[in-house]
Amino acid sequence: MIKNMKQRIFLWGMLALATSFLVGCGSDETVPAAQHSQYTTFKSSGGALTRAHYMLNHTKGTGATVSWQPDDHLWLYLSEDLRLKDIGNDITTLTPNANFYFPSGYERNSYKVDFLGHTANTDGRYININAQHYQNVPNNTDHMRYNGDCAEGTATKVAGQDNLYEVAFTHLPAYLCIMPYNSDDFVRTGAVIKNVKVLSNNPIRGRFDVGQYGLDVNHGTNLANDIEVVLNNPNGFPMDNATMDQAKNAVYVVMLPGWHDLTIEFYYTSPKFPGQTLCARRNIGNREYKANSMTDIVADIANYYGANNEYITVGDEVSLAKKQGTVQVYEDKTWNSMLNQ
């Protein structure tokens, strides 16, 4: 059973509702402290909400810690046609706790609240798990907030406390941390991994109305079965490691949860084969990738294919490298509010 990410949100109300704010847009600026009392405030506490940009300190088989950053935003789901973005926050640096400001006048017993990733990837209604992710730094999750990172929760009024709401958020996507290495010293010396493709037997990406339907594929559009992560375009990441080296070349993917039969393709270059792009293909098999969890995939790519996915046969040295590669899969326990086990 998936555990929700829990924290509290506080609502400090004003008397008048500023109807001009009910348009789903807001400022990306930090709200000055002197103005805080003018707004309804959502305050996260007990750990950050659900951040992809700074999922820090993840290691194989463990969760991660998270932090808010200044351009994070929340959305209130008021109705099918009305989603309200906060007008700002009090965040000036990475922090586990933050205040998000909305107009006053909210008195329902509960509100649905969504985190929809970076505003470049949402209009407050839809988010996109994109066909291409661009990861510029090894072992970094910055790109995921542009590619479908999202969460939902219900803010419920706390009994006996005016304007105080508590909410439990849940990550909606599943996440992969892919860590390649090459046990063959002939090919790995100077090798650079350029991109990674994740192929599935069913949809792992698309466009979704998170507030109304979450990541339900029955209500998604632009569904597709593949995701490509382009690495530090066009330079790639080093891949001269003989064993797993997360800091050197870990790749992160955000995708739809569910049962998937995944195949991962690793495209890279080696000085031993000038002008060629090598490809190693690893099938993971059919398994469940739960929402609100990260699955670590450690893959030895020491057998080689050309770009046409056929074995390379250009000499005895290469034939020695044509051994069966290995892949291990480690699923983290579902994260709690700090993304730890």
Regions found by a protein language model. Name each.
Residues 2, 6-15, 22-341:
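Sec-type signal peptide cleavage vicinity
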